[in-house]
């Protein structure tokens, strides 16, 4: 048995890629898209016809140049997501633009539009997760969307305050980041960590512990892995989203995997809900989380801007 096969017995494996060939090869349950992955798709032969067809339709439907670009981003995200749903049994995560991370109402409106586009392609909302940054406004948007039957994936999650706010809001899934947490600590300390001491692994284990101990329904999906050791350190987490390079490492080695995360039982009562003031204070007091959340939003926004420039050039 390969390590990938062994891991799939302990955690649901999600492909952190939009590459159709990689998805076919590794057979994940779920997959994800974001502006960075859509940019990479421009270099993948499997998507060229889809890109050409989508942009031609946008040009035919819309005259205003900026409106064309905005619509092209949405339609392309959904077109790629729709292709991916043909290859997986589960869901595809589709991202709300990072520039909307502090606007609850605009995030909700964008989510509605993405779901509408999926439904026009015959893909029901039960096959889609709307991906939002774990800001206070993003979490509040997700809370409303969940009430409407639109389930969400809260990303760029680096702190216990963010996780608890998501649990309180009843969001479907959160994506606490491993690699970026560890990157920050390595840069600050110059230290190398074993998987057991790895700050990102320790953080996600704590999030899993809270979710399990207090019986929150939210799915925890470890994300942003740098090494195979980090992945193995979270074996047993509800879900793990893994890049093709690390999926290949896991597939190329034989052997069993030890469960590192287990159900820790039932607390007699839940934690008190975290309000906005406590959320913002908790985030403020965590320098790593504050810096990494801001950096992550900027990175996604930069990728979105690059994608928009590329689309504007193609749309003419």
Curated annotation (Swiss-Prot):
Its main location: cytoplasm. Belongs to the transaldolase family. Type 1 subfamily. Coiled coil: none annotated. Its EC number is 2.2.1.2. It catalyses: D-sedoheptulose 7-phosphate + D-glyceraldehyde 3-phosphate = D-erythrose 4-phosphate + beta-D-fructose 6-phosphate. The gene is tal. Signal peptide: none annotated. GO terms for biological process: carbohydrate metabolic process; pentose-phosphate shunt. This is Transaldolase. GO terms for cellular component: cytosol.
């Amino acid at each position: 048995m390969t390590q990938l096969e062994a891991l799939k017995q302990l955690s649901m494996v999600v492909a952190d890629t939009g590459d159709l060939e990689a998805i076919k090869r590794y057979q994940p349950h779920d997959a994800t898209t974001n502006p960075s992955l859509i940019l990479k798709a421009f270099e993948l032969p499997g998507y060229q016809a889809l890109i050409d067809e989508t942009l031609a339709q946008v040009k035919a439907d819309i005259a205003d140049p900026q409106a064309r670009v905005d619509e092209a981003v949405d339609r392309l995200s959904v077109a790629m997501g729709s292709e991916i749903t043909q290859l997986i049994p589960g869901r595809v995560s589709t991202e709300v633009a990072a520039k909307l991370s502090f606007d609850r109402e605009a995030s909700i409106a964008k989510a509605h539009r993405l779901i509408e586009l999926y439904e026009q392609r015959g893909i029901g909302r039960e096959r889609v997760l709307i991906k939002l940054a774990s800001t206070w406004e993003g979490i509040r948007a997700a809370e409303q969307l969940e009430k409407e039957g639109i389930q969400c994936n809260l990303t760029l999650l680096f702190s216990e305050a963010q996780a608890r706010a998501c649990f309180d809001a009843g969001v479907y899934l959160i994506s606490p980041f491993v690699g970026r947490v560890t990157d920050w600590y390595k840069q600050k300390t110059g230290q190398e960590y074993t998987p057991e001491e790895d700050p990102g692994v320790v953080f996600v284990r704590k999030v899993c512990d809270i979710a399990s101990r207090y019986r929150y329904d939210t799915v925890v999906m470890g994300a942003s892995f740098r090494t195979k050791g980090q992945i193995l350190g979270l074996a047993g987490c509800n879900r793990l989203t893994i890049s093709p390079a690390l999926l290949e490492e896991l597939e190329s080695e034989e052997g069993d995997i030890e469960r590192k995360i287990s159900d820790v039982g039932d607390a007699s009562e839940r934690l008190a809900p975290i309000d906005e003031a406590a959320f913002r204070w908790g985030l403020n007091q965590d320098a790593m989380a504050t810096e990494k959340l801001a950096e992550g939003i900027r990175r996604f926004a930069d990728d979105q801007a690059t994608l928009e420039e590329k689309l504007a050039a193609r749309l003419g």
